[in-house]
Amino acid sequence: MNVDHEVNLLVGEIRRLGSKGNDGKFSVKFGVLFSDDKCANLFEALVGTLKAAKKRKIITYQGELLLQGVHDNVDIVLLQD
């Protein structure tokens, strides 16, 4: 699977699992994304896909590396609709 395809899938999953904030942008907690069965089956390396999407300025989140448990409450925000 190529990175662009995985990033597009990630955008769809953020929309599916997240909610739209007052700013009109979708966001989801990292823990929700990480724990979802569909996401677990879609992404071999979720953190790598998140980093690629952040580098492309499609999403944003605080920090550089997200770890299960430690960063479960970090918001992943979709910048592009």
Curated annotation (Swiss-Prot):
The gene is abracl. InterPro entries: Costars, Costars_dom, Costars_sf. Disulfide bonds: none annotated. GO terms for biological process: regulation of actin filament-based process. PANTHER family: COSTARS FAMILY PROTEIN ABRACL. Belongs to the costars family. It holds the Pfam family Costars. It comes from Xenopus laevis (African clawed frog). Coiled coil: none annotated. Gene3D superfamilies: Costar domain. This is Costars family protein ABRACL.
